[in-house]
Structure formats: structure tokens, C-alpha cells
Amino acid sequence: MADRWDVSEELARLAAHIAKFRQTAGGGESEGRKLDFLIQEMNREVNTMGSKVGDAEFRWGVVEAKSCLERIREQIQNVE
């Protein structure tokens, strides 16, 4: 059961995706497709964490994170 609640791997991957997103977004070129892919990967990690953790408060955090990621995705599509 403890492994099911352990989201340390997902958090590490999410942090790596965020770092790459910042690096890519800071570049001068239009990297919309790369950014969109990174958002997709971040969303996947957030979904996995949501399915692993049963805590209601944590799940509301997952919903908020997914909402933020969707808003970022919309902004990326507007720039493309």
C-alpha cells in the first residue's frame, strides 16, 4: 500500500518536465509543439499522482494542477 501512495518518481519527472518547459519557453524561437508535448507529459504525471493518492485534499490539488496545465496549453496554442 505504501508504494501505491509513493509519488516521488512522478514528482521528480514533473520537476524535470517543468525545468525543460522553462528552458524551452525562454528560447527565442517558436517552440509551440515542444511546449505542447511537455504540457502533455506534465498532465500525465499529475494524472498518475491523482490515481495513486486517495486523499481528497490531494485530489483537489490534482484538479487545480490539471486546470492550470489546460490554461497554459490554450496560451501555447494561441501563440502558435
Predicted segments with their positions:
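N-terminal intrinsically disordered, cationic/polar leader segments
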Residues: 1-80
